[in-house]
Amino acid sequence: MDAKHPVRTTEKTLALVEELMQKGPCGVTELAGDLDMGKSAVHNHLTTLQKHGYVLKDGDDYRVGLKFLEVGGHSRKSMEVYQVAEPEVKSLAADTGELANLLVEEQGMGVYLMRAKGDDAVDLDTYAGLRTNLHTTALGKAILANLPESRVDEIIERHGLEQKTPKSIGTRQELFQVLEGVRERGYAIDDGERLEGLRCLAAPIKSSSGEVLGAISVSAPASRVSDEDLHGALPERVLSAANVVELNINY
């Protein structure tokens, strides 16, 4: 929900943080130019952030500090779905030898809470805290399929249907057709829709009242995951992991 009376000073501080996050270490002059702010104002924001450990200074450049990791770690640790799912995600990775993930929805985006690597897992661009469009991942589609249609429409309106690869879902009609299939099967598939050459299978994690709390998945190169795998032992293992998490949360 948009704030009725946003605080401009706070918005400018956050814009600086996000610019540093996207670009990496930057100096005052570069940041001022990129954000159309005065150099004095940029310097004041940065030194305040530095004072509290959120920004560090290396020479003439500033970079995001690890204080944000402390804040994010605290937020993640306080979430019951993370506490309960963590051992299952690790077990899923060990059993399959692949990459296992846990994702939740926040403000219409998917947020990776954790990942665990099996012996043969590929090293992807995902990390705890990474945000991604829900419609491009099996994890996200598992969540979307269990949200009210009106909520899905809100997410589309806010974030659109960005094409990450040629296989990404690009229309509302296509998305809702896919989500119907997810509900029928009980799990979602991503066949190169966020990263080409990668296949992913995910199952939702739901509360006793049916509220979707997140999703758990396994990701692997397409060369190691056949069509038969996507409809055989792999969904059984992922669904089993999701079921264990649900039982531990609900009972």
UniProtKB/Swiss-Prot annotation:
It comes from the Archaea. Residues 7-66 form the HTH iclR-type domain. The keyword DNA-binding applies. SUPFAM superfamilies: GAF domain-like, Winged helix' DNA-binding domain. Keywords: Activator, DNA-binding, Plasmid, Repressor, Transcription, Transcription regulation. Transmembrane segments: none annotated. InterPro entries: ArsR-like_HTH, GAF-like_dom_sf, HTH_MetabolicPath_Reg, Tscrpt_reg_IclR_C, Tscrpt_reg_IclR_N, WH-like_DNA-bd_sf, WH_DNA-bd_sf. Residues 28-47 bind DNA. Disruption phenotype: Deletion mutant loses its ability to grow on both D-xylose and L-arabinose. GO terms for molecular function: DNA binding; DNA-binding transcription factor activity. Residues 81-251 form the IclR-ED domain. GO terms for biological process: negative regulation of DNA-templated transcription. Homodimer. Essential for D-xylose and L-arabinose catabolism. Activates the expression of genes involved in D-xylose and L-arabinose degradation (xacABCDEF) and represses its own synthesis. Also up-regulates the expression of the genes encoding the ABC transporter complex XacGHIJK. This is HTH-type transcriptional regulator XacR. It comes from Haloferax volcanii (strain ATCC 29605 / DSM 3757 / JCM 8879 / NBRC 14742 / NCIMB 2012 / VKM B-1768 / DS2). The lineage of its organism: Archaea, Methanobacteriati, Methanobacteriota, Stenosarchaea group, Halobacteria. The gene is xacR.
